[in-house]
C-alpha cells in the first residue's frame, strides 16, 4: 500500500484500502469495535496509518457544538505519577463541567498515535499528553485545528506547546548529593529505556556526570530495564550486589514504577534495605513510608502538575493566544531510612 499524498482522504478511501465497509470504518473511529473482528481492526489501523487519515468532522472544523471532553493520554497508567496527575486533572474538570477521556499508551508510539487519532475523532476540546516523544505530525495537526495541547512531565522541544514539568536536573543532583553524603561509593541508576523521553534523559545525564566523578573508579552503572521482565531485573540486581562487594552500594530508581519492581525483586533475592543496598527514587507515595525502613524519594508535585495542566487547557479554550509557557513546579527530597 502507498500513502496518499494529495487530496482529502475519506472514510471510503480507508474502507477500500482495508477491504471493509464504510460503516465498519465508522464504527471503529467511534470506538465501537466490539462487533468488529480482530483482523478487520488490524486492517483498518494499517489503512488509517498509511493513508494518514484524519476524521473529516475535525479536519474540516465542522464541530456543531462543544463536546466538553478533554483527552488525557498517559504513558503508563500503572505509574504512580500518572495516577496522581489524573486526580489533579479530574478535580479541575469536575469543577468546570468537563469529562475526561483517558488513554494509556504503554509508552508505545504506535499506540499513542492510535489514541491521538481517536481523541481527534471524538472532538476533544483539549489534550493533556504525557508524550512518548514521537507523533509530532499528529500534534501539529491538533495545533492547526486549534485544539489546546498541554504537555505534562515530558517535553517536546521541537513543538511550541505549553508544558508543565519539574526541574529534573536540579532535583536529581540534589538527591544524588544526599546519597553520596551517606558514604555510598558505588551508586547505580535503574531506569526504563530512555529513548527520547526527556525526564529520563535529563535525570540520566545528571547521574552520569556525578557517578563519573564520585563513584569508585569513576564507574557509571546505568541499567536500562524492561519492567515487565522480572527475571532481567533480578539478574541485574544480583550482579550489581555481587560485583565489588567491599563497596557501599545504592540504587537510584528513575520512577515510581521501577522502584516498586526493585523493592519486590530485592525481597525475593533476600537483599536487605539499606544493609545490602541503599535505595532512593522518584514519585513519593503514602506507602513509601510504610515499606521496610521507609524509602527516600523525590516528591514530585504530580497532582499539582495535573491541575496546572488542566488549568492551562481551560485558559487556551477561553481564548488565551499568548506564547507557549513552560511551567516548572518544585519537587523536594523526602529523606527516610532506606539510605
From Swiss-Prot:
Q: Does the keyword Transit peptide apply?
A: no
Per its record, what are the GO molecular function terms?
ATP binding; DNA ligase (ATP) activity; DNA-binding transcription factor activity; transcription cis-regulatory region binding
DNA-binding feature ranges: 11-30
Q: Tell me, which GO biological process terms does this entry list? A: DNA recombination; DNA repair; regulation of DNA-templated transcription
Q: Cite the PROSITE patterns for this sequence.
A: HTH_LACI_1 (PS00356), HTH_LACI_2 (PS50932)
Q: Does the keyword ATP-binding apply?
A: no
Entry superkingdom: Bacteria
Task: Explain the induction of this protein.
Answer: Induced by galacturonate and negatively regulated by itself. Is subject to catabolite repression by glucose involving the ccpA gene.
HTH lacI-type domain location is 9-64
Which InterPro entries does the protein's record reference?
A: Cro/C1-type_HTH, DNA_ligase_ATP-dep_cent, HTH_LacI, LacI/GalR-like_sensor, Lambda_DNA-bd_dom_sf, Peripla_BP_I
Q: Which keywords annotate this record?
A: DNA-binding, Repressor, Transcription, Transcription regulation
One Pfam entry for this protein is Peripla_BP_3
Query: SMART domains under this entry?
Result: HTH_LACI
**Which function does this protein serve?**
Transcriptional repressor of the kdgRKAT and kduID operons for pectin utilization.
Please identify the protein, giving its name as recorded. HTH-type transcriptional regulator KdgR
Q: Which organism is it from?
A: Bacillus subtilis (strain 168)
- As recorded in Swiss-Prot or TrEMBL, the protein's gene is named kdgR
